[in-house]
UniProtKB/Swiss-Prot annotation:
Residue stretches making up the tr-type G domain: 10-204
Provenance organism: Geobacillus kaustophilus (strain HTA426)
Protein name stated in the entry: Elongation factor Tu
UniProt-listed Enzyme Commission number(s): 3.6.5.3
Entry keywords, A to Z: Cytoplasm, Elongation factor, GTP-binding, Hydrolase, Magnesium, Metal-binding, Nucleotide-binding, Protein biosynthesis
Swiss-Prot/TrEMBL catalytic activity: GTP + H2O = GDP + phosphate + H(+)
Length: 395
């Protein structure tokens, strides 16, 4: 039988399974594909196929991630599942797998555990906007009251991290029983996917967001002016649009785009994903540099001080061999450039060991265009020693 081709006509959403080790994330992922495969909407994947996730490198960090895809009547999904806890932490902080929503798997037999809390906290800090709960292993719990107790605990935990605990859909099921083909539990997988369809909104597409392009290179064309090149990160740009040049200087500079080129051809409009050159009116060669961004005026602002959630590479990953302390001054690599910054660790945290993840405050020596969710690397002498995600802007 020929492989079915996924139709790209449906809206696309990125999701993933999160939760404590052994609560059934991978079994649930397998169950979703298996149940949907019976309706011809997925290719069934066995537990072992998902569990043997290939290693990928993102910002110099090795992460094991399994990717599966499937669809419902409403949407097309790309779903990530990580075998190990450390893989989740790295994945979420580097943004290697950007999630529009997550399915939090909690074993009804055990209730919320430390990594349940940690994954909810990470979701909050790296900007996973919506969570749907799957209470797993319900076939092992005879006591209805116990199920309700676990559900309440999970809802309280979500509320603690500013998710709407009262509104979050909670589906009670058994991934293993569904995987084994028990119709009563297969129905719960359908129920879960309906909740995901309805509760997790279709994300705004990158092209619909305000324009932004990190500047990679700058050159001047005699008689025409200054050109900034880079890959459009989001939004669209056309000739005549006003843009701001933001970062590395105290005040953003506003200018107008007088030409947009791609592969040396003139373009009416550039959009997210395009590599372009933008001709800037009245801007001299020394007023623009790599590391700045071009953006729709007022859409993003330069900052020097922020809080961030950071994963520190282990020695084996090529990171530091020794811990670091407050006042550590590495380079912070944002998009296209390094800026020195000073780290302040939270109260009660003396030092950070390779392999840890920690929230820290960073003060940069020059302003950079950042917002909540902006990703960065921490570098020392050109090698990556950490990866982070901005969780809060201070100034």
């Amino acid at each position: 039988m020929a492989k079915a081709k996924f139709e790209r006509t449906k809206p696309h959403v990125n999701i993933g399974t999160i939760g404590h080790v052994d609560h059934g994330k991978t079994t649930l992922t397998a169950a979703i594909t298996t149940v949907l495969a019976k309706q011809g909407k997925a290719e069934a994947k066995a537990y072992d196929q998902i569990d043997a996730a290939p290693e990928e490198r993102e910002r110099g960090i090795t992460i094991s991630t399994a990717h599966v895809e499937y669809e419902t009547d409403a949407r097309h999904y790309a779903h990530v599942d990580c075998p190990g806890h450390a893989d989740y932490v790295k994945n979420m902080i580097t943004g290697a797998a950007q999630m529009d929503g997550a399915i939090l798997v909690v074993s009804a037999a055990d209730g919320p555990m430390p990594q349940t809390r940690e994954h909810i906290l990470l979701s909050r800090q790296v900007g996973v906007p919506y969570i749907v709960v799957f209470l797993n292993k319900c076939d092992m719990v005879d006591d209805e009251e116990l199920l309700e107790l676990v559900e309440m605990e999970v809802r309280d935990l979500l509320s603690e991290y500013d998710f709407p605990g009262d509104e979050v859909p909670v589906i009670k099921g058994s991934a293993l029983k569904a995987l084994e083909g028990d119709p009563q539990w297969e129905e719960k997988i359908i129920e879960l996917m309906n909740a995901v369809d309805e509760y997790i909104p279709t994300p705004q597409r990158e092209v619909d967001k305000p324009f932004m392009m990190p500047i990679e290179d700058v050159f001047s064309i005699t008689g025409r002016g200054t050109v900034a090149t880079g890959r459009v990160e989001r939004g669209t740009l056309k000739v005549g649009d006003p843009v701001e040049i933001i970062g590395l200087s105290d005040e953003p500079k506003t200018t107008t785009v007088t030409g947009v080129e791609m592969f040396r051809k003139l373009l009416d409009q550039a959009e997210a994903g395009d590599n372009i050159g933008a001709l800037l009116r009245g801007v001299s060669r020394d007023e623009v540099e790599r590391g700045q961004v071009l953006a729709k005026p007022g859409s993003i602002t330069p900052h020097t001080k922020f809080k961030a959630q950071v994963y520190v590479l282990t020695k084996e990953e090529g990171g530091r061999h020794t811990p670091f302390f407050s006042n550590y001054r590495p380079q912070f690599y944002f998009r296209t450039t390094d800026v020195t910054g000073i780290i302040t660790l939270p109260e009660g945290v003396e030092m950070v060991m390779p392999g840890d993840n920690v929230e820290m405050t960073v003060e940069l020596i020059a302003p950079i265009a950042i917002e909540e969710g902006t990703k960065f690397s921490i570098r020392e002498g050109g090698r990556t020693v950490g990866a982070g995600s901005v969780s809060e802007i201070i100034e």
